[in-house]
């Protein structure tokens, strides 16, 4: 059976300190990822706080804000939490922030993070997440997957 899946992805990115154009140019990603350079530029050039169709069935909304200001409830299926670690940005790894994430996820929604610190795991569990340790990507021994359960 060969049926075409036609799902749409609505990706919401929340960033308090975005990379500016000069910094982006210095990274030289256009020359590194040549085949996707136009998409990369489109993602960085599109306006903040507005939904953009990046590709057919892929929509991006970049929100210029702190996650602590997010008030969406039961809206997201997945959160990719790729902040600097708790040692560098302890304010992003608190029960307060994880409760906001828990509330913003739909039932059975998933949060993933490269941080596998015990304090992170405990804070996720304390707000209601079911937390699992997973094998990490190259360079990381472990990562965490937290699922919103009742």
Give the positions of each predicted feature.
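Conserved beta-strand signature within the Rossmann-like core of class I S-adenosyl-L-methionine
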Residues: 78-80, 107-115
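Core SAM-dependent methyltransferase catalytic element
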Residues: 127-150
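A short glycine-rich, Lys/Arg-flanked "PGG" loop and its adjoining helix->strand segment in the class I
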Residues: 91-108
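Conserved SAM-binding loop of SAM-dependent methyltransferases across substrates and taxa
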Residues: 1-6
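Conserved SAM/SAH-binding beta-strand->alpha-helix loop
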Residues: 17, 117
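S-adenosyl-L-methionine
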Residues: 23-73
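Conserved SAM-binding motif I beta-strand of class I
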Residues: 10-15
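A short SAM/SAH-binding and catalytic strip from SAM-dependent methyltransferases
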Residues: 77-91
């Amino acid at each position: 059976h060969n049926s075409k899946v036609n799902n749409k992805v609505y990706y919401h990115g929340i960033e308090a300190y975005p990379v500016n154009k000069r910094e982006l140019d210095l990274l030289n990603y256009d020359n590194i990822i040549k085949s996707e350079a136009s998409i990369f530029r489109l993602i960085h050039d599109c306006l903040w706080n507005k939904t953009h169709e990046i590709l057919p069935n892929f929509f991006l909304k970049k929100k210029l804000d702190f996650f602590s200001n997010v008030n969406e409830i039961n809206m997201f299926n997945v959160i990719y939490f790729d902040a600097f670690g708790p040692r560098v940005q302890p304010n992003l790894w608190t029960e307060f922030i994880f409760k906001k994430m828990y509330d913003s996820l739909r039932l059975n929604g998933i949060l993933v993070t490269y941080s596998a610190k015990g304090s992170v795991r405990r804070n996720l569990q304390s707000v209601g997440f079911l937390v699992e340790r997973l094998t990490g990507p190259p360079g990381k021994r472990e990562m965490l997957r937290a699922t919103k359960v009742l």
